Structure formats: C-alpha cells, structure tokens
Design a protein with these regions (language model features):
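Long, contiguous binding/interaction regions
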Residues: 1-59, 65-89
C-alpha cells in the first residue's frame, strides 16, 4: 500500500520495465541477470522483445513483481548503469 498520498504506485505490484539497448546476442541475458539479482520470482519467459526497424536496437519489456519503491529504484539504477543499456523506461 502507498505510504504517502503523493505516491502513484501501490506496492507490492507488478511493474513493466522497458529496457532498450544495442542489438546483441547477450543483451537479453544481461537484463535477465540484473533483474534476477533483485527479484527472486522473475519469469524471463514472459519478456516481450522487439527489434528496431533498422535492426540496431532491441527493446525488452519485463513485467517485474516488486515489493517496494526502493527495490524498483535499485533495478532501474543497475539496468541504467550497464554500458549496453541505452534507456530504461
């Protein structure tokens, strides 16, 4: 439940995270590894993958069950900090 009236998200919840990076064979494995460090029950089989029209980038949409805002923030920080990641939305 949201502790603060200004919070827009109530935890725990499923939260979609979109990660965009340069197309490579290992990018999805990198994203899965990072998320697994924070979420025990992450189901990588449900990731939605979409390549860009020119084939240069790939986006992964991961529906992640998070318990707290802090947990979600740590996932974003780690994904954003990886050199192969371009954007995390």
């Amino acid at each position: 439940m949201a502790d603060n009236e200004n919070e827009l998200i109530e935890f725990p919840c499923y939260f979609p995270i979109k990660v965009i990076g340069k197309m490579s064979e290992e990018f999805s494995s990198i994203v899965i590894t990072i998320i697994n460090q924070h979420v025990e029950s992450f189901d990588a089989t449900k990731i939605e993958m979409r390549g860009s029209s020119n084939g240069k980038y790939i986006s992964l949409t991961c529906n992640v069950f998070v318990e707290t805002k802090e947990q979600l923030d740590k996932i974003y920080i780690d994904l954003s900090g990886h050199p192969q990641t371009q954007f995390v939305i």
